[in-house]
Amino acid sequence: MTRKGEDTEATMSPASVSILWETPYKVIEFPKLVDGKAYFYHAIGTDDDEKEFFNHGNALLGAFDAAGNLLWSWHLWCAEFDPADEQVELGGEVMMKRNLGAGVVSGTSEEDILASYGVYYQWGRKDPFVGPRYYNMADSADAQVYDSQNLRVYPEYAATDAERGSAGYASAHAMTFITGTKESGYNWLQTADASLWGTEKNNNDPCPKGWKVPSKEVFAALHIKDVISPELEKNYGFTLSDGTNEAFFPGAGRRSFYTGALTNMNDNEVRPTPWTGYYWSSTGEGKEAYAMDFSFDINGTRAGSSFQGAALQYAAGGMQVRCVKIR
């Protein structure tokens, strides 16, 4: 029997495992199932020129039954860092300094800005969706991802309805971004369920073992530490503080609750949309859930910013997650 997540009681009997998607450069290879356990290869070491390498990135590994139905999936986050060395006491909790799925904390190059975004989650779902292909979200293009045969694969987008609007369907269709409708209150669920993440860690919580999605109270305790500065403009984000400690949060945009498209900034010269950051909390309320959001203008002709530590957002939206330690 194979375990689902961290719950020792939630088991299954898969027939195979396979890569649903992974970011470029073969984050993992050769997945196989042996005696109910999933194995895979991750390359790390030195190349022919004796240069050290580590395959950074994200992957989604799926377990399937004999008919090819997806039974469960695991997000594999491969990053060269130790959370114990990159954490900060913030808002009353011990928080990671980088977004879930991110390759770096922050950066000024286009490559590092993009790597700092991490992956995107619909509220209450355990499986991530990839971020943009370009740091500025040009054409709303998704990052390129590949399956076990190294073939390009793409996320699917489908509106919630009586069939798709359930946690069971979402788990069995991990690559389908379930968009909200007016009738659903722009929730991907047909019947809202605030317990999918909640205050206690469960199998839907996407954070690594020992970590969880923070409650709304954590973000509500934060504020913008500095006004817009040239340095912040280079990093595309804000340093947030609880009055004692601080951490950087990239303005990584979000996926639309209505279309699933990646959005952050448009080219309207009259009223340019500022760069934005959206971070889910674990706190749901009715058909919506609380998130932290901020925006800042990098137009250069004016300075402006906004910040909400805990505001209700449509649950079908895809946003970042910043994990806190369970203690």
Language model regions located:
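Short, compositionally biased
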Residues: 1-201, 315-327
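C-terminal, surface-exposed recognition/capping segments
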Residues: 60, 102, 180-327
